Amino acid sequence: MAATPLPPPRRPVFSRGSWAETRRVTEILRKETVGGVILLVAAAAALIWANSPWAEGYFALRDLELGGEWFGLHLNLTLGAWAADGLLAIFFLVVGLELKREFVAGDLRDPSRAALPIAAAVGGMVVPALIFVLVNLNTGDGALRGWAIPTATDIAFAVAVLAVIGTHLPSALRTFLLTLAVVDDLLAITVIAVFYTEDINGLALALAAVPLALFALCVQRGVQKWWVLVPLSVATWVLMHESGVHATVAGVLLGFAVPVRRQATPRGRGPAPSQRVGMAEYFEHRVRPVSAGIAIPVFAFFAAGVSIGGLDGFTRALSDPITLGIVLGLVLGKPIGIVLTTRVLSAVTRANLDASLRWVDVVGMSMLAGIGFTVSLLIGDLAYGLGSERDEFVKIGVLFGSLLAAGVAAVVLLTRNRAYRRIYREETVDEDRDGVPDVYQTRQDRT
């Protein structure tokens, strides 16, 4: 009697990816670490100024109006609004580039690898939202509009925390954290477009498709000239802003329009820089430093400034249901949603955790995902209005919740730092000195 063939081995949960993907993630996180440090400095400066004797100067600067109305376009915005609507569009352009790259050439193109981060991101969004709703169910007066505030993850803040505590997070968890944050950003921009858009100007929205289509046509044909692409991008942003849809959506759509694959080079001609690496990667290399080093820190400076009012004011804010819902959503909801979803998915697929990891590692990583800063503050502004009393409670909740999540994550991850250092050494050994660590060669993951 013939023996029953054994089923093929299942890919373990949080298994190590390819060398090319690991190298790309490492480079992205290195840049985000620098941006995260600048972000923290900008947020700290805003908090100090907003709680100093010169606080009026900060709020006067934030509320200073610039712009005007030209050709029926309403572009008379405060500096805070310019940062939220304009500069964050650059951040979401990078998000769009990342998303397309992940779905076309990254881990998300493989359904078996994409299932876990997508499911974890959804779980990490649903549970914090439910906690916020439960806490604010009887608050009334539109409090539930902020349900999406504790659902976001700030990858720059998270990797800055990793840099500060000096831990070598294994490559599998680093890749998962970045992929989770990318999917998280997609869900966030979808929520903003669907739930925080009220009056839509159909004509302006239709007109926005024209410069967007021209931009897509240009980049598909390999056009790189800034004097062509920047005006088309600005026109798309202006018309999207006028349409009533949040202008940051324009950034994501522009990112989606950029091709990922390398373009064929005519015979006899050397490839352009973008053709050697792919247009999306070429754009990302140039736009990410602007996003991480300028756009996000400036937004954080104008968004994080809140007059706490001393210990009494802080205590009063923490007793408010909105603040409490945000803190609980970030600190408890995010890790519970991510870990629970991961456990359920691993049980359904009968996949075991990678041999080098433990579930406490997943808990620590999911606590990092509870650091919701940039997008959480943006959603708070949209939900309650910039400068409103509830917006002040949002800022305190996001800041305190993110710092608390970062602190817990640091404690959890530091307890495993010795194991992480061992894994890091294993992942960097290159005995044949060919530039590819041996663990990736044994897995035939050179590409």
Curated annotation (Swiss-Prot):
Main location: membrane
Record keywords, A-Z: Antiport, Cell membrane, Ion transport, Membrane, Sodium, Sodium transport, Transmembrane, Transmembrane helix, Transport
GO molecular function: sodium:proton antiporter activity
Record's catalysed reaction(s): Na(+)(in) + 2 H(+)(out) = Na(+)(out) + 2 H(+)(in)
Signal peptide (UniProt feature, chain positions): none
Source organism superkingdom: Bacteria
InterPro entries: Na/H_antiporter_dom_sf, NhaA
GO biological process: regulation of pH
Location(s) in or outside the cell: Cell membrane
Transmembrane segments: 34-54, 77-97, 115-135, 146-166, 176-196, 200-220, 290-310, 321-341, 359-379, 393-413
Known role: Na(+)/H(+) antiporter that extrudes sodium in exchange for external protons.
NCBIfam families, per database record: NhaA
Name of the molecule in the record: Na(+)/H(+) antiporter NhaA 2
Gene (UniProt): nhaA2
